Amino acid sequence: IPPKKGRKHILRIIRELLDFTPQSKSTDIGQAIEYLTQAIKRRCTAFLLSDFIDRKDYRTALTVANRKHDVVAIQVFDRRMADLPDVGLMKVCDAETGHEQYIDTSSRKVRKAHHDWWKNRQNLLQDTFTKSNVDSVSIRTDQDYVSSLMTLFAKRN
């Protein structure tokens, strides 16, 4: 969607997001960022809204895009991504590959390993944003997003 101003354009963006049907289940954040860099010629503020779970490295694409545009990363995630609930056997499915498996969430060792993976992943993600000079915010789906966004925008001013 090309950048424009006005209420009508905002409603179009919302409609496009609601009606969007992905052509593929796989994620390639780097490809989306490269498209932004090539397609939008004039400098703009681009909001990158994602869970940022991607097997591919997109740091270079993000750095290049942020030199040309003002990129703001907004990570949205469910709290259970950070801390698995203790509910016994849980069937999990990789949304991209369709691979399913059962994990025993009653095991403290399993929950700790997952939590450690999440913390490491978040540290790597923050490192990517810092080295790319991209402002970012992480928002849980069960949190009030307004205060998080207000803090981000206050920091940017």
Residue ranges and their predicted role:
Residues 1-11:
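A short alpha->loop->secondary-structure connector
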Residues 4, 19, 23, 112, ...:
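Charge-dense, low-complexity intrinsically disordered segments
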Residues 9-44, 56, 78:
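Von Willebrand factor
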Residues 38-42, 54, 60-157:
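Von Willebrand factor type A / integrin I
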Residues 45-51:
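Acidic beta-strand-to-loop metal/phosphate-binding motif
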